[in-house]
Protein backbone atom coordinates (compact mmCIF):
# COMPACT_ATOMS: atom_id res chain seq x y z
CA UNK A 1 0.00 0.00 0.00
CA UNK A 2 2.79 2.43 0.89
CA UNK A 3 4.43 1.76 -2.49
CA UNK A 4 1.40 2.82 -4.53
CA UNK A 5 1.46 6.33 -5.96
CA UNK A 6 -2.04 7.79 -5.29
CA UNK A 7 -1.70 9.96 -8.42
CA UNK A 8 -0.96 6.89 -10.57
CA UNK A 9 2.04 8.55 -12.20
CA UNK A 10 4.75 6.23 -10.86
CA UNK A 11 5.22 2.52 -10.30
CA UNK A 12 7.12 0.89 -7.45
CA UNK A 13 10.63 -0.21 -8.42
CA UNK A 14 9.87 -3.87 -7.66
CA UNK A 15 6.73 -4.11 -9.83
CA UNK A 16 8.29 -5.10 -13.18
CA UNK A 17 10.37 -7.89 -11.66
CA UNK A 18 7.42 -9.30 -9.73
CA UNK A 19 5.16 -9.24 -12.80
CA UNK A 20 7.85 -10.93 -14.91
CA UNK A 21 8.38 -13.63 -12.28
CA UNK A 22 4.64 -14.31 -12.07
CA UNK A 23 4.31 -14.46 -15.86
CA UNK A 24 7.26 -16.85 -16.07
CA UNK A 25 5.77 -19.13 -13.40
CA UNK A 26 2.36 -19.14 -15.13
CA UNK A 27 3.89 -20.20 -18.46
CA UNK A 28 6.03 -22.86 -16.75
CA UNK A 29 2.91 -24.28 -15.09
CA UNK A 30 1.03 -24.27 -18.40
CA UNK A 31 3.90 -26.11 -20.09
CA UNK A 32 4.05 -28.54 -17.20
CA UNK A 33 0.45 -29.55 -17.94
CA UNK A 34 0.92 -29.98 -21.70
CA UNK A 35 -1.20 -32.71 -23.31
CA UNK A 36 0.76 -35.55 -24.90
CA UNK A 37 -0.95 -37.34 -27.77
CA UNK A 38 -0.32 -39.06 -31.08
CA UNK A 39 -0.42 -35.95 -33.26
CA UNK A 40 2.19 -33.96 -31.34
CA UNK A 41 4.48 -36.98 -30.88
CA UNK A 42 4.33 -37.73 -34.62
CA UNK A 43 4.96 -34.07 -35.42
CA UNK A 44 7.97 -33.99 -33.08
CA UNK A 45 9.53 -36.85 -35.03
CA UNK A 46 8.57 -36.03 -38.62
CA UNK A 47 9.33 -32.29 -38.46
CA UNK A 48 12.93 -33.08 -37.49
CA UNK A 49 13.97 -35.22 -40.47
CA UNK A 50 15.00 -34.06 -43.97
CA UNK A 51 12.03 -33.48 -46.28
CA UNK A 52 9.74 -34.26 -43.33
CA UNK A 53 9.41 -37.84 -44.59
CA UNK A 54 9.74 -40.94 -42.43
CA UNK A 55 8.97 -44.63 -42.72
CA UNK A 56 6.22 -46.01 -40.51
CA UNK A 57 8.70 -48.36 -38.82
CA UNK A 58 11.08 -45.46 -38.04
CA UNK A 59 8.20 -43.35 -36.73
CA UNK A 60 7.10 -46.18 -34.45
CA UNK A 61 10.63 -46.43 -33.02
CA UNK A 62 10.77 -42.67 -32.43
CA UNK A 63 7.45 -42.59 -30.59
CA UNK A 64 8.50 -45.58 -28.49
CA UNK A 65 11.66 -43.66 -27.56
CA UNK A 66 9.67 -40.51 -26.69
CA UNK A 67 7.34 -42.44 -24.39
CA UNK A 68 10.27 -43.99 -22.54
CA UNK A 69 11.91 -40.58 -22.19
CA UNK A 70 8.73 -39.11 -20.72
CA UNK A 71 8.60 -41.98 -18.24
CA UNK A 72 11.99 -40.94 -16.81
CA UNK A 73 10.46 -37.90 -15.08
CA UNK A 74 7.98 -38.99 -12.36
CA UNK A 75 5.94 -35.82 -12.92
CA UNK A 76 5.21 -36.89 -16.52
CA UNK A 77 4.00 -40.41 -15.83
CA UNK A 78 0.38 -39.48 -15.12
CA UNK A 79 0.06 -37.80 -18.55
CA UNK A 80 1.83 -40.39 -20.73
CA UNK A 81 -0.54 -42.06 -23.23
CA UNK A 82 -1.15 -45.73 -22.45
CA UNK A 83 -1.78 -46.64 -26.11
CA UNK A 84 0.92 -48.41 -28.14
CA UNK A 85 3.11 -46.36 -30.53
CA UNK A 86 1.29 -47.81 -33.56
CA UNK A 87 -2.10 -46.92 -32.08
CA UNK A 88 -0.88 -43.35 -31.49
CA UNK A 89 0.25 -43.19 -35.13
CA UNK A 90 -3.15 -44.38 -36.35
CA UNK A 91 -4.87 -41.79 -34.16
CA UNK A 92 -2.66 -39.07 -35.65
CA UNK A 93 -3.36 -40.26 -39.21
CA UNK A 94 -7.11 -39.98 -38.59
CA UNK A 95 -6.72 -36.19 -38.22
CA UNK A 96 -5.64 -35.91 -41.90
CA UNK A 97 -2.50 -33.95 -41.04
CA UNK A 98 -0.28 -36.62 -42.64
CA UNK A 99 -0.34 -38.61 -45.86
CA UNK A 100 0.69 -42.25 -46.10
CA UNK A 101 2.68 -43.41 -49.14
CA UNK A 102 2.85 -47.14 -49.88
CA UNK A 103 5.82 -47.88 -52.15
CA UNK A 104 5.47 -51.65 -52.04
CA UNK A 105 7.39 -54.43 -50.30
CA UNK A 106 5.66 -53.42 -47.06
CA UNK A 107 7.43 -50.05 -47.20
CA UNK A 108 5.17 -47.21 -46.07
CA UNK A 109 6.21 -43.61 -45.57
CA UNK A 110 4.53 -40.71 -43.79
CA UNK A 111 4.86 -37.03 -44.59
CA UNK A 112 2.76 -33.91 -43.87
CA UNK A 113 -0.37 -33.43 -45.93
CA UNK A 114 -0.35 -30.49 -48.33
CA UNK A 115 -0.37 -27.17 -46.46
CA UNK A 116 -0.04 -28.76 -43.01
CA UNK A 117 3.65 -28.09 -42.28
CA UNK A 118 3.04 -24.90 -40.31
CA UNK A 119 0.33 -26.47 -38.17
CA UNK A 120 2.50 -29.52 -37.48
CA UNK A 121 5.25 -27.18 -36.30
CA UNK A 122 2.69 -25.78 -33.86
CA UNK A 123 1.85 -29.31 -32.63
CA UNK A 124 5.56 -30.04 -32.20
CA UNK A 125 6.10 -26.83 -30.26
CA UNK A 126 3.31 -27.80 -27.86
CA UNK A 127 5.53 -30.48 -26.30
CA UNK A 128 9.14 -29.74 -27.34
CA UNK A 129 9.84 -28.19 -23.91
CA UNK A 130 9.25 -31.63 -22.33
CA UNK A 131 12.12 -33.04 -24.41
CA UNK A 132 14.52 -30.10 -24.06
CA UNK A 133 16.78 -31.73 -21.46
CA UNK A 134 17.09 -35.23 -23.03
CA UNK A 135 17.53 -33.63 -26.47
CA UNK A 136 20.31 -31.45 -25.05
CA UNK A 137 22.04 -34.53 -23.62
CA UNK A 138 21.69 -36.29 -26.99
CA UNK A 139 23.32 -33.32 -28.75
CA UNK A 140 26.22 -33.19 -26.29
CA UNK A 141 26.94 -36.92 -26.60
CA UNK A 142 26.45 -37.10 -30.38
CA UNK A 143 28.55 -34.06 -31.22
CA UNK A 144 31.41 -35.15 -28.96
CA UNK A 145 31.29 -38.84 -29.95
CA UNK A 146 32.70 -39.85 -26.58
CA UNK A 147 32.66 -37.79 -23.40
CA UNK A 148 32.97 -38.23 -19.64
CA UNK A 149 29.71 -38.53 -17.73
CA UNK A 150 30.71 -35.62 -15.50
CA UNK A 151 31.45 -33.44 -18.56
CA UNK A 152 27.99 -34.21 -19.96
CA UNK A 153 26.49 -33.03 -16.69
CA UNK A 154 28.66 -29.89 -16.62
CA UNK A 155 27.95 -28.94 -20.25
CA UNK A 156 24.24 -29.65 -19.82
CA UNK A 157 24.02 -27.39 -16.79
CA UNK A 158 25.75 -24.56 -18.67
CA UNK A 159 23.46 -24.79 -21.71
CA UNK A 160 20.17 -25.77 -20.11
CA UNK A 161 19.74 -22.37 -18.45
CA UNK A 162 19.14 -20.92 -21.92
CA UNK A 163 16.77 -23.67 -23.03
CA UNK A 164 14.81 -23.37 -19.82
CA UNK A 165 14.30 -19.62 -20.17
CA UNK A 166 13.55 -19.73 -23.90
CA UNK A 167 11.28 -22.79 -23.97
CA UNK A 168 9.93 -22.43 -20.40
CA UNK A 169 10.98 -26.01 -19.72
CA UNK A 170 9.39 -27.24 -16.46
CA UNK A 171 12.56 -28.52 -14.78
CA UNK A 172 13.46 -27.20 -11.34
CA UNK A 173 17.07 -26.36 -10.57
CA UNK A 174 17.11 -28.74 -7.60
CA UNK A 175 16.05 -31.65 -9.84
CA UNK A 176 18.39 -30.97 -12.76
CA UNK A 177 21.39 -33.16 -11.86
CA UNK A 178 19.16 -36.06 -10.86
CA UNK A 179 17.20 -35.87 -14.12
CA UNK A 180 20.40 -35.67 -16.17
CA UNK A 181 21.63 -38.90 -14.58
CA UNK A 182 18.25 -40.59 -15.03
CA UNK A 183 18.11 -39.71 -18.73
CA UNK A 184 21.66 -40.96 -19.26
CA UNK A 185 20.75 -44.22 -17.51
CA UNK A 186 17.70 -44.54 -19.77
CA UNK A 187 19.84 -43.97 -22.87
CA UNK A 188 22.20 -46.70 -21.65
CA UNK A 189 19.36 -49.13 -20.93
CA UNK A 190 17.81 -48.55 -24.36
CA UNK A 191 21.16 -48.98 -26.14
CA UNK A 192 21.45 -45.46 -27.59
CA UNK A 193 24.79 -45.02 -25.83
CA UNK A 194 27.36 -47.28 -24.16
CA UNK A 195 29.67 -46.75 -21.18
CA UNK A 196 33.25 -47.76 -20.47
CA UNK A 197 34.16 -46.82 -16.90
CA UNK A 198 32.91 -43.20 -16.78
CA UNK A 199 33.25 -42.55 -20.52
CA UNK A 200 30.04 -42.41 -22.59
CA UNK A 201 30.04 -43.40 -26.28
CA UNK A 202 27.50 -43.13 -29.08
CA UNK A 203 26.11 -46.57 -29.93
CA UNK A 204 25.16 -47.82 -33.38
CA UNK A 205 21.89 -49.21 -32.02
CA UNK A 206 19.03 -46.75 -32.37
CA UNK A 207 21.35 -44.08 -33.75
CA UNK A 208 18.71 -42.61 -36.10
CA UNK A 209 16.14 -42.17 -33.34
CA UNK A 210 18.76 -40.65 -31.04
CA UNK A 211 19.81 -38.23 -33.78
CA UNK A 212 16.18 -37.25 -34.52
CA UNK A 213 15.72 -36.52 -30.81
CA UNK A 214 18.73 -34.19 -30.89
CA UNK A 215 17.37 -32.24 -33.87
CA UNK A 216 14.32 -30.83 -32.07
CA UNK A 217 16.45 -28.20 -30.27
CA UNK A 218 19.49 -28.11 -32.55
CA UNK A 219 18.80 -24.63 -33.96
CA UNK A 220 18.36 -23.30 -30.43
CA UNK A 221 21.81 -24.60 -29.52
CA UNK A 222 23.43 -23.16 -32.65
CA UNK A 223 21.95 -19.76 -31.76
CA UNK A 224 23.49 -20.05 -28.31
CA UNK A 225 26.88 -20.72 -29.90
CA UNK A 226 26.39 -17.66 -32.13
CA UNK A 227 25.69 -15.50 -29.07
CA UNK A 228 28.59 -16.99 -27.08
CA UNK A 229 30.96 -16.39 -30.00
CA UNK A 230 29.78 -12.79 -30.27
CA UNK A 231 30.17 -12.34 -26.51
CA UNK A 232 33.64 -13.87 -26.57
CA UNK A 233 34.62 -11.27 -29.18
CA UNK A 234 33.12 -8.35 -27.21
CA UNK A 235 35.53 -5.94 -25.54
CA UNK A 236 34.64 -4.53 -22.14
CA UNK A 237 32.94 -1.13 -22.28
CA UNK A 238 32.76 -1.02 -26.09
CA UNK A 239 29.10 -1.89 -26.77
CA UNK A 240 25.65 -1.85 -25.20
CA UNK A 241 22.88 -4.48 -25.35
CA UNK A 242 21.28 -3.30 -28.65
CA UNK A 243 24.71 -3.26 -30.31
CA UNK A 244 25.44 -6.74 -28.97
CA UNK A 245 22.13 -8.03 -30.38
CA UNK A 246 23.05 -6.57 -33.79
CA UNK A 247 26.40 -8.31 -33.51
CA UNK A 248 24.63 -11.65 -32.89
CA UNK A 249 22.44 -11.11 -35.96
CA UNK A 250 25.52 -10.28 -38.02
CA UNK A 251 27.33 -13.43 -36.84
CA UNK A 252 24.25 -15.51 -37.69
CA UNK A 253 24.57 -14.45 -41.32
CA UNK A 254 27.99 -16.10 -41.47
CA UNK A 255 26.52 -19.58 -41.03
CA UNK A 256 25.84 -21.65 -44.16
CA UNK A 257 22.28 -22.53 -45.09
CA UNK A 258 23.06 -26.21 -44.39
CA UNK A 259 23.23 -25.26 -40.71
CA UNK A 260 20.45 -22.67 -40.41
CA UNK A 261 18.06 -24.15 -43.00
CA UNK A 262 17.03 -20.51 -43.59
CA UNK A 263 15.21 -20.59 -40.25
CA UNK A 264 13.79 -17.15 -39.33
CA UNK A 265 14.90 -17.56 -35.71
CA UNK A 266 18.47 -16.68 -36.73
CA UNK A 267 17.23 -13.25 -37.84
CA UNK A 268 14.94 -12.62 -34.86
CA UNK A 269 16.32 -9.94 -32.50
CA UNK A 270 13.73 -10.86 -29.84
CA UNK A 271 15.28 -14.32 -29.34
CA UNK A 272 18.74 -12.82 -28.92
CA UNK A 273 17.28 -10.25 -26.52
CA UNK A 274 15.92 -13.14 -24.40
CA UNK A 275 19.39 -14.67 -24.42
CA UNK A 276 20.87 -11.35 -23.29
CA UNK A 277 18.53 -11.36 -20.30
CA UNK A 278 19.75 -14.87 -19.45
CA UNK A 279 23.39 -13.78 -19.86
CA UNK A 280 22.78 -10.96 -17.39
CA UNK A 281 20.75 -13.10 -14.95
CA UNK A 282 23.54 -15.67 -14.74
CA UNK A 283 26.40 -13.11 -14.72
CA UNK A 284 27.97 -13.91 -18.09
CA UNK A 285 28.25 -10.17 -18.53
CA UNK A 286 27.36 -7.06 -16.54
CA UNK A 287 25.73 -3.84 -17.69
CA UNK A 288 27.18 -0.87 -15.82
CA UNK A 289 25.65 2.56 -15.29
CA UNK A 290 26.94 3.79 -18.64
CA UNK A 291 24.94 1.01 -20.36
CA UNK A 292 28.09 -0.75 -21.60
CA UNK A 293 28.77 -4.48 -21.34
CA UNK A 294 31.55 -6.00 -19.24
CA UNK A 295 32.22 -9.69 -19.84
CA UNK A 296 32.75 -12.34 -17.15
CA UNK A 297 35.44 -14.09 -19.17
CA UNK A 298 35.86 -17.32 -17.11
CA UNK A 299 32.12 -18.07 -17.31
CA UNK A 300 31.98 -17.24 -21.02
CA UNK A 301 34.96 -19.51 -21.75
CA UNK A 302 33.28 -22.37 -19.86
CA UNK A 303 30.07 -21.87 -21.84
CA UNK A 304 32.05 -21.68 -25.07
CA UNK A 305 33.72 -25.03 -24.30
CA UNK A 306 30.27 -26.57 -23.82
CA UNK A 307 28.76 -25.04 -26.96
CA UNK A 308 31.58 -25.27 -29.53
CA UNK A 309 31.39 -29.07 -30.16
CA UNK A 310 27.70 -28.67 -31.08
CA UNK A 311 28.72 -27.36 -34.51
CA UNK A 312 31.02 -29.00 -37.06
CA UNK A 313 34.65 -27.82 -37.03
CA UNK A 314 34.33 -26.19 -40.45
CA UNK A 315 31.26 -24.20 -39.43
CA UNK A 316 32.87 -23.10 -36.15
CA UNK A 317 35.70 -21.59 -38.22
CA UNK A 318 33.17 -19.85 -40.47
CA UNK A 319 31.31 -18.50 -37.44
CA UNK A 320 34.59 -17.15 -36.06
CA UNK A 321 35.16 -15.29 -39.32
CA UNK A 322 38.03 -17.45 -40.55
CA UNK A 323 38.60 -17.74 -44.29
CA UNK A 324 38.63 -21.37 -45.41
CA UNK A 325 40.66 -22.81 -48.26
CA UNK A 326 39.21 -25.33 -50.70
CA UNK A 327 41.18 -28.08 -48.94
CA UNK A 328 39.03 -27.88 -45.85
CA UNK A 329 36.66 -30.83 -46.01
CA UNK A 330 35.27 -31.23 -42.53
CA UNK A 331 32.07 -33.24 -42.57
CA UNK A 332 28.99 -31.21 -41.69
CA UNK A 333 27.17 -32.85 -38.82
Model-predicted segments: where are they?
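Membrane-interfacial terminal anchoring regions of lipid-handling membrane enzymes
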Residues: 1-333
Amino acid sequence: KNDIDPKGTARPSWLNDIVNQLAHRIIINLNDSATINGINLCALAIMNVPDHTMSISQLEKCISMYLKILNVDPRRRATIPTASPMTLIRQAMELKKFRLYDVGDDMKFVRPSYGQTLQLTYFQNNIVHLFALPALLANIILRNGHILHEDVRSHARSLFYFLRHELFAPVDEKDLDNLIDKHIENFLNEGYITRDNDMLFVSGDGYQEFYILSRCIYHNLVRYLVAVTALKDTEDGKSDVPEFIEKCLSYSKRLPVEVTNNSPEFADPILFKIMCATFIRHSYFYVKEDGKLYVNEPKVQKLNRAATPLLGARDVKILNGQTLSRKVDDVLF
